[in-house]
From Swiss-Prot:
Protein's organism: Gallus gallus (Chicken)
Subcellular location as annotated: Cytoplasm
Bias (Gly residues) ranges: 9-19
Similarity comment text for this entry: Belongs to the eIF-3 subunit H family.
Biased composition, class Low complexity, residue ranges: 266-285
A GO term for molecular function: translation initiation factor activity
Span of domain MPN: 35-169
Keywords: Cytoplasm, Initiation factor, Protein biosynthesis
Name listed for the protein in its UniProt record: Eukaryotic translation initiation factor 3 subunit H
Biological role stated in the UniProt entry: Component of the eukaryotic translation initiation factor 3 (eIF-3) complex, which is involved in protein synthesis of a specialized repertoire of mRNAs and, together with other initiation factors, stimulates binding of mRNA and methionyl-tRNAi to the 40S ribosome. The eIF-3 complex specifically targets and initiates translation of a subset of mRNAs involved in cell proliferation.
Pfam families associated with the record: eIF3h_C, JAB
Major site of localization recorded for this protein: cytoplasm
PROSITE patterns, sorted: MPN
Species classification: Eukaryota, Metazoa, Chordata, Craniata, Vertebrata
Amino acid sequence: MASRKEGSGAAGGGFGASKGKGKAATTGDSAVKQVQIDGLVVLKIIKHYQEEGQGNEVVQGVLLGLVVDDRLEITNCFPFPQHTEDDADFDEVQYQMEMMRSLRHVNIDHLHVGWYQSTYYGSFVTRALLDSQFSYQHAIEESVVLIYDPIKTAQGSLSLKAYRLTPKLMEVCKEKDFSPEALKKANIAYENMFEEVPIVIKNSYLINVMLWELEKKSAVADRHELLSLASSNHLGKSLQLLMDRVDEMSQDIVKYNTYLRNVSKQQQQKHQYQQRRQQENLQRQSRGEAPLPEEDINKLFKPPQPPARMESLLIAGQINTYCQNIKEFNAQNLGKLFMAQALQDYNN
């Protein structure tokens, strides 16, 4: 279900980009160095997941705003409605047109600047997300994808990150050549596939005053639940997902090693054929006969098709994401452990 929804995001990206490209480009053509998000957008994304997100099913939506110099300002958003395969009459392009027309009538920013998606235990580095973001970023250079992690957020801190495809990966995706030689030539590794853009959440002055008043009213006892260490399920699930991706990587390595063995075997066969051919020509020349005609050796020995390596890079990137999440999670729990111990000693 997640992959189907991600794939539909790619179609929406192409439409939204074509609608907003000209207007967005007038505000600034430089690369995005910061993403500024209104607090209302964050609340809408969280509300969307709470209403429609279930288990590992992701929710997605469109980000609206504008580009100012090297800063991308996200001022509003709207969700993609959940629908099943049976909803054949649903037209996502028409849905986006109607939403943007309605927003324009009430004088709200209606230019597409990217999209958002929830994630399940950090599982977002997929081919579907890559294709969707490429569709957006190819049409509007400043487009970003926001990844919201509801499970991390439930642990006590908002988890919202903005990502873009690196220029190197954009060039490779344009060429659509994901062979080992092409990725090696472009110097593409999982570390430089995505770039994270810093996020700043901005609220109005009235909202800041209200938050300050709420913070003064909240008692210290209300926050003790944030020191809870009952999180073995989260760690266990993350480790299980990590092991699954490692198994996939192991299978992919076996396939690639098989390809390398086949290439090496064919090279040996070509070398042996050339040696036999050369010896036959020498014998024919000694008998005064004409040498054998030259043949296209590549037609006789068709090279094996190299496997695409993009999936391997995505799996490696996902493994790295899981490792970073586990590292951060354990660091937070260690901090909670020391704080809980200090609080207990203080109360005693």
